[in-house]
Amino acid sequence: QATERELADAAAKADRTGMYNCPHTGVALAVLIKLRNSGQISGSERAVVISTANGLKFTDFKLGYHRGLLPELSSTLSNVPIELSNDYDAVRKQVDELTGL
């Protein structure tokens, strides 16, 4: 079992690796973290979590988490989206600024 906060934090942690998980997969990831932390899955073992839903169906939830707009959750792993125009140069400039290039 996983709380709303545990699933949101687990999904946010996965977001930082380039994934875009749904809350259902967030539950599975949160439980995986719990099993690893409790030693039921050791550091030498491998585990696979199969995501069967698409995070795009839950964009409002994910944006709410990362923008800190979910009153019942503190967004401890928020990664606030940056909105840019649909323009290559604007995107490139922002990437350069964020990466120090």
Predicted regions and their residues:
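Active-site-adjacent helical/loop segments in soluble small-molecule enzymes
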Residues: 1-43
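Phosphate-binding loop/pocket of nucleotide- and phosphate-handling active sites
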Residues: 30-101
